[in-house]
Amino acid sequence: MNSPMSPVGELFSMIRIISFLIILSFPILGYTPGKWSHKDAYLFKKVKKVPNKEIVRNGEGQVVYVAEYEYNSDGKLITETYSDKEGKGDGKTTFRYTDGLLSSEEVYDNGGHLVERKDFQFKGRALKKMNVKDGEGRLLIVYSIESDGEGNVFAAEGKNLETKDNESFRFQIDPKHPNVQIQYLTDDKKKGLGEIHFKFDTKGNLVEREFFQGENRRVHKLKYKADGSLESHSFHVKQGDNWILEKTHVLVYE
């Protein structure tokens, strides 16, 4: 489950760490401009060890919501079911596949009503386009995507059909820190909307992503088990000179 956000996801989180011209060596999956989730790997490829549950706690350690995951026989994620801090149902997201490729993602509220639908189009095994529709089927956003056959997104541009706004991104390796890559987010006039710095360890695992937007700064930290599986990830916001813990996600494996 991504954060801080609703189950639908926020626009400016993360995406595949690749520039337009240089293919980098660290595989991060993602299909929406500016969005990343550890679950993307469960949609595009078969992962040996996948979690069956994710527990989210606030800065005080209280459980705020839980996500439970269901997979098909190929190991692909097919259902993500949410419950609130009291254990009551809070909607779900379902995923469908055609010939092993992700074809749609549907978000439902607690009453079972469709809130949002995403349709995916591929060329071969490379994701090329994604259409976002509301619960009534109205087309809201069209994403043009450059990706490879592994689900890794290189570049993308989103066009909002209602506001007529466009948003895109580009990547650049930090020349002083080769294990750090910078994502620049821009609008249709190439005005900077912010940037995100990604830090990797020597094994190629993403361990930190830091967000810069004006005076605002946030950090997302990821922790791994000895076998390389994601153990937990946490979100922090800077207030003055201090970093404040917002929430922590703990993954549960059977």
Mark where each language-model region is:
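Intrinsically disordered, low-complexity segments enriched in serine/proline and basic residues
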Residues: S3-S6, E10-L11
